[in-house]
Structures are given as structure tokens and as C-alpha cells.
Amino acid sequence: MTMSQDSRSTPGSTVDPAEIAKFSKLSETWWDPKGKMAPLHKINPLRLTYIRDAACRKFERNAKSLNCLSGLRMLDIGCGAGLLCEPFTRLGAQVVGVDPSASNIAAAKLHAEKGHMSIDYRCTTIEEMDPRERFDIVLAMEVVEHVTDVGAFLGRCAAVLKPGGLMVVSTLNRNWKSFALAIVGAEYVLRWLPRGTHEWSKFVTPDELTKYLLDNRLVITEQSGVVYSPFADRWSLSSDMDVNYMVVAEQMV
């Protein structure tokens, strides 16, 4: 497979060139809340709150403070156009956003400049980053279902996590329900997402994710399902992890 100039992949990388191409096509619409990334805009407030609260519990911060993440270094892997990077920067975190799509990073930088925000955006992969870099918080939100080797990917994530650091992962479970809702429903019936956005075979079950994390000396301390209510038109946390779910993991002592 040949690589376009809009994407990056190196030998040993877990990046899938086809996955990069999918999201590169959406780069111009990332910040349109009514565009093709509308589902991400709808779920984003819940993701932000979940991550913020987990970080504040871990690092003993007041979640109500406007600068509750001040002094903490955060890495957002697969950051897209910065939908998580910008609000966490506002909360005081020193954010590094990485994405293998050049057009996504260009869109992220442009939007940050318009908002007069200083965010360290890089068109790169976790494998290409300086292994000496360290972060208090590492995010892999809706990423593991798009990589070629989940275990190797999480190993690189764990390597840049500071001792006592926190990792947050969100992904999709793999079962008949997730196929019906996340593939058939979201991509073909409701058309929330472009067809082919996800491959059901790449979805990761909670048990699989737990094992991948443990193999890299990361233990899950919190987990929650994420469900959508069509009547309220909003996402909420739930004990139901059949489709979307998030986990918080810490290094084993």
C-alpha cells in the first residue's frame, strides 16, 4: 500500500494508512457541530467531564476550579482537530496533541490560532515520539479500534506515562449489539458517520482491553459504559458496556 503525503507511518508503527485516510477526508469538518463529526461533538462534553474528574481524583485537584489541571502534562493520541486538546488547555493542562494526518493537524493548528491558544500539535505517531518524553495523563480516545496492533500501541502509550500517571482509553465493544448499533445503525441507517468509518472486527472487548493493559503493567481503576438516549438526544455514563465504553488505568506498583 502506498502512503499519501497527508499521512505518516513508519516501519514498526501500529498506524493503519487506510484509517488515516478516512479521517483526513473529514479534517475540514471537524469543528462543525452539525457536520459529519456531529456525533463526536455530542459525546465530547461527557468525555471531557469523565477525564477531568478522573484526573482530579488522581491528582487531588478541585474539579470545579477553572485551572484544575494546571501543571499537568497531557498527551492526546489521535487528537484529530483538537476537540479534546482545546478544552483541557483551558483547564490549565500542558497539552501535546499528536495525529498521523497532516490535514487534521493543520485544522487543529488553525482553530487554536483563531482562539489564541498555545497547543503543541505534532503530525506524528506515538511510535515516532521521543521515548524520553513523559506525561501525567495519556489519552487514547476512540483510537485502539483503528490501530493494527493494540498491544504494541498500548505498550508505547505506557512507555511515555510518568510514574503514578493516568491513562484513559475509550473504544467500542465487539458483539452483535455493537454491530447493530455502531455499524448498521450509525453508519447505514441514521448516517451519523460515513460508511466504513469503523471495522467491527477491530472493536475491542473489555476483557481484551484489560489483558492488553495488564500486559503493559497498567491496571484498570475505573470503567464505564457510554450510552445514547434518542429521546433526550444526549450521551450519559452507564453500567452497560455493550457498545461504547471508557476505562481509566494506572501503572501497577
Curated annotation (Swiss-Prot):
Superkingdom of the organism of origin: Bacteria
Residues where S-adenosyl-L-methionine binds: 47, 78, 99, 141
Biological process annotations from GO: methylation
Record gene name: ubiG
Role description: O-methyltransferase that catalyzes the 2 O-methylation steps in the ubiquinone biosynthetic pathway.
Stated family: Belongs to the methyltransferase superfamily. UbiG/COQ3 family.
Protein name: Ubiquinone biosynthesis O-methyltransferase
PANTHER family linked: METHYLTRANSFERASE (PTHR43464), UBIQUINONE BIOSYNTHESIS O-METHYLTRANSFERASE, MITOCHONDRIAL (PTHR43464:SF19)
Single GO MF descriptor: 3-demethylubiquinol 3-O-methyltransferase activity
Regions crossing the membrane: none
Enzyme Commission number(s) of this protein: 2.1.1.222, 2.1.1.64
UniProt xrefs under InterPro entries: SAM-dependent_MTases_sf, UbiG_MeTrfase
Reactions mediated catalytically: a 3-demethylubiquinol + S-adenosyl-L-methionine = a ubiquinol + S-adenosyl-L-homocysteine + H(+); a 3-(all-trans-polyprenyl)benzene-1,2-diol + S-adenosyl-L-methionine = a 2-methoxy-6-(all-trans-polyprenyl)phenol + S-adenosyl-L-homocysteine + H(+)
Pathway assigned to this chain's UniProt record: Cofactor biosynthesis; ubiquinone biosynthesis
First-level EC class: transferase
Species assigned in the record: Bradyrhizobium sp. (strain ORS 278)
Alphabetic keyword roster: Methyltransferase, S-adenosyl-L-methionine, Transferase, Ubiquinone biosynthesis
